[in-house]
């Protein structure tokens, strides 16, 4: 058998450079020195007798040969990973790993409980939870870096043909106010009362903010008239702001169980308005699904 002109380590280094965008970042992600990365790529290019990167650009840009090589290198590494996963399954979930992805609110408040239930049954499975934006999580599933994910935002159009997308649950969003707010004593308010409130909210580009604005608009609420006093970048910051009387907010019900129990905030119902968003379980149908991933998916759908 003819010796191959590359090693798996060289493929991993090459892939890391493409994914990270530079030799330096690739070295950092692999915990090796940049000179070691450069040397491996030089040796690889010599063995292949083809330049893989255009050195005239600051960012690592692939040559035509590099683009072809990246396509096959990714497939080789994916097959190696799938081989290891398939062998792990022979242990009947007594070993192995599971990488789960989730968008911000879901990963922070919903997934820990689901993972806890799974770990009670399968304590020997190493579970990793990655929490990022919906777009980044969807791309990671498509690339095979995440086994299964739960998201609540719009999936990039170009990824839809590459993913298996299954409705998982509905996430209810509710209005909360400080416990001493006049509305806290009311069982229900009218939608016109929203114009009297001062709001703290996530950034207007966030998934939850878009869902809320869309549903309010559908119910005749002019979101441009709502008094947005402050934009924050996390649900925890929003909850704290409401507790300190800085305004009202729309948040996921799953994020405020403790605050409601301790009477730190009050939930206020809006007449004839229900704000919900669909959550989806996504996987990559073109990638080998480990027994751990399959079992976790089934558990989620049966909770």
Curated annotation (Swiss-Prot):
Subcellular location: Plastid, Chloroplast
Annotated function: Trans-acting transcriptional regulator of RuBisCO genes (rbcL and rbcS) expression.
Domain of life: Eukaryota
InterPro entries in UniProt: LysR_subst-bd (IPR005119), Tscrpt_reg_HTH_LysR (IPR000847), WH-like_DNA-bd_sf (IPR036388), WH_DNA-bd_sf (IPR036390)
Name this protein carries in UniProt: Probable RuBisCO transcriptional regulator
Pfam families to which the protein is assigned, alphabetical: HTH_1, LysR_substrate
GO molecular function, one term: DNA-binding transcription factor activity
Main location: plastid
Keyword flag Magnesium: no
A GO CC term assigned to this protein in UniProt: chloroplast
Keywords: Chloroplast, DNA-binding, Plastid, Transcription, Transcription regulation
Ranges where the HTH lysR-type domain occurs: 6-63
DNA-binding region location: 23-42
Family that this chain belongs to: Belongs to the LysR transcriptional regulatory family.
């Amino acid at each position: 058998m003819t010796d191959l002109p590359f090693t798996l380590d060289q493929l991993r280094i090459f892939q890391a450079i493409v994914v990270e965008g530079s030799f330096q970042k690739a070295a950092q992600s692999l915990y090796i020195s940049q000179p070691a990365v450069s040397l491996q790529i030089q040796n690889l290019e010599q063995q292949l007798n083809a330049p893989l990167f255009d050195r005239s650009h600051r960012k690592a840009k692939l040559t035509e040969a590099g683009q072809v090589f990246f396509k096959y290198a990714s497939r080789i590494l994916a097959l190696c990973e799938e081989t290891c996963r398939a062998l792990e399954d022979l242990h009947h979930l007594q070993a192995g790993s599971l990488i789960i992805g989730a968008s911000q609110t879901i990963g922070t408040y919903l997934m820990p409980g689901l993972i806890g239930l799974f770990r009670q049954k399968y304590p020997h499975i190493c579970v990793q939870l990655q929490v990022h934006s919906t777009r980044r999580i969807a791309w990671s599933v498509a690339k095979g870096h995440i086994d299964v994910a739960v998201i609540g935002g719009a999936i990039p159009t170009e990824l839809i043909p590459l993913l298996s997308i299954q409705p998982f649950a509905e996430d209810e969003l509710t209005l909360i106010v400080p416990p001493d707010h006049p509305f806290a004593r009311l069982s229900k308010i009218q939608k016109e009362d929203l114009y009297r409130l001062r709001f703290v909210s996530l950034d207007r580009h966030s998934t939850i903010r878009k869902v809320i604005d869309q549903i309010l608009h559908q119910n005749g609420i002019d979101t441009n008239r709502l008094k947005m006093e402050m934009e924050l970048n996390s649900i925890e910051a929003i909850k704290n702001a409401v507790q300190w009387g800085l305004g009202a907010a729309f948040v996921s019900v799953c994020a405020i169980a403790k605050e409601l129990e301790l009477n730190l905030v009050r939930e206020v119902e809006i007449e004839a308005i229900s704000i919900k968003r669909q959550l989806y379980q996504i996987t990559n149908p073109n990638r080998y699904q480990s027994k751990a991933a399959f079992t976790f998916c089934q558990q989620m759908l049966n909770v």
